[in-house]
A protein has these predicted regions:
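Short acidic (Asp/Glu) and glycine-rich catalytic loops that position anionic groups and cofactors
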Residues: 16-19, 33-37, 282, 396-397
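N-terminal amphipathic, basic helical "cap/leader" segment at the start of enzyme domains
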Residues: 2-6, 10, 26-172, 176-177, ...
Length: 468
């Protein structure tokens, strides 16, 4: 009897669960002031947020679609439902989440992950969080981990108003303005001075509704001398119409603090993923980005770090896998503003079956950023002649006292490596999957073991049928 390969053993169905839609409320399609007012009232916004949404809509209408990057002609905002409320309020006890939603998250492993390796979990379904909880021992340290709406309306209202969309503003680009107008859901995190959160927090975003958008906002403030690892996971079932994800992440890393922000994205192949992420790092602070991008039809994602304080540091480690029908345009940006700052980008991109993978790096060294050091390394692996991989570096150096370097490599899987692994009993497909997993090891080794396994499973799923 022939043994199944480890590629075949993976259950593909868990990533493409499509629930029956039981929405409590679905906003009509389109973008008008009346729709934004309706959304604001539906969510019970304070007056300042209602005004902010309308101002953002005005900016959105004034701005043009960016004329660079992948084509988004297949995305018609007028046919996107910008708000879909699930049939439950947010719960703090997993037992109280409706069974159909609970089944979806349980198949994705969310409750199990919470029990095993997480300090807290937020689970968003369409436009609202359905579950949020933080372990007692973490809350006892003074760590705040709640949903954005509760933070905005409760005791952290002043803090939210102080930081909300100040790092990413509606005028940054058209889809930042769209986010400002229709945002819903997301997480608020505050880590007090000196607190070391020893195990990660996670938010998981699931978009189930057909022809809808998800616009969660994540705001994290890590105070002086504190540290945190935050993990973000994303998935959606595949439909024959476009879905949109245009979330926003704002990270504030105070003096001597450290934040690692990890993302594993497995959006469906009808998704337009137009996310905006930015970090502001103070003196002696450290921001670490770990990113795995495996899904979406079109992806545009360039996390940006502003190294404001002296001796602040940024590291970006990423892997992108573009398969058939995918155009993933990703990368990272860094602005060196303080003295003796450092940044390091280390990325891997994989393309197969005609997929297009583009890596854009942007390094800016301000005039006063003496002693800045930056290193960019991008390696690409193309699995066939139909695929494409591009590297587009940009450097703006305004001081002579800086060290900046860029390295790019492109290659393919050697026949010798395939032959060697097959001589050890592997099938050709398994051999290719193993080599690709090793190529992406720079990201998986930075994740907790449960998430490293998940990422390697996603690579194996993408590699299925890669022969011929």
């Amino acid at each position: 009897m022939k043994e199944k390969s480890y590629v075949e053993d993976i259950d593909r169905s868990i990533y493409d669960i499509r629930d029956a839609e039981h929405d409590a409320f679905r906003m009509e399609e389109g973008l008008t002031p009346a729709i934004i007012d309706k959304l604001s009232k539906e969510k019970g916004d304070p007056v300042w947020m209602q005004q902010f949404r309308l101002q953002s809509l005005q900016i959105y209408n004034e701005m043009a679609v960016p004329d660079w990057g992948p084509s988004i002609e297949g995305l018609d905002i007028d046919h996107i439902a910008t708000y879909v409320r699930p049939n439950t309020a947010m719960q703090n006890d997993w037992k109280n989440v409706p069974q159909d939603i609970k089944d979806t998250f349980e198949r994705l492993g969310i409750p199990e992950a919470e029990r095993k390796s997480l300090a807290g979990v937020g689970a968003q379904y369409d436009s609202e969080l359905v579950y949020h909880n933080v372990k007692d021992e973490v809350a006892a340290q003074g760590v705040v981990y709640t949903d954005m709406e509760s933070a905005m309306k409760g005791e952290y209202a002043d803090m939210v108003r102080k930081y909300f969309m100040k790092l990413v503003t509606p005028r940054d680009h058209k889809f930042a303005a769209l986010h400002g107008a229709v945002w819903s859901g997301g997480s608020f995190v505050y880590v007090p001075k000196g607190v070391q959160v020893s195990i990660p927090l996670q938010s998981y975003f699931r978009l189930n509704a057909k022809g809808a958008g998800q616009f969660e906002h994540t705001l994290i403030i890590v105070d002086e001398g504190a540290s945190l690892h935050f993990i973000e996971g994303c998935s959606a079932p595949k439909y024959n119409v476009a879905n949109l994800h245009a979330g926003c992440v704002e990270l504030y890393v105070k003096k001597g603090a450290k934040l690692r922000y990890s993302t594993i994205e497995n959006w469906s192949k009808n998704m337009y993923n137009l996310n905006t992420k930015r970090a502001l790092v103070e003196e002696d602070g450290v921001i670490e980005w770990v990113s795995g991008s495996f899904g979406s039809h079109v992806g545009c994602l360039y996390p940006m770090s502003v190294l404001k304080g002296d001796n602040s540091r940024m590291e970006f480690t990423g892997v992108t896998f573009a398969g058939s029908g995918q155009n993933l345009d990703t990368g990272a940006k860094v602005v060196h503003a303080g003295k003796n700052t450092s940044s390091y980008m280390n990325t891997r991109s994989i393309s197969k079956s005609g997929g297009i993978s583009t890596f854009r790096s942007s390094v800016v060294v301000e005039k006063g950023a003496k002693g800045a050091k930056s290193s960019v390394s991008c390696q690409s692996l193309m699995l066939d002649s139909q695929s494409r991989s591009d590297t587009i570096p940009a450097m703006d150096i305004r001081t002579k006292d800086a060290s900046v370097g860029h390295e790019a490599k492109i290659g393919s899987i050697s026949n010798e490596a395939i032959f060697y692994l097959m001589s050890r009993g592997m099938s050709e497909e398994d051999a290719r999957a193993l080599i690709v997993s090793g190529f992406a090891d720079n990201v998986s080794k930075e994740l907790p073991v449960e998430y490293a396994v998940e990422m390697n499973n996603l690579i194996r799923l993408e590699m299925k049928g890669s022969i011929g």
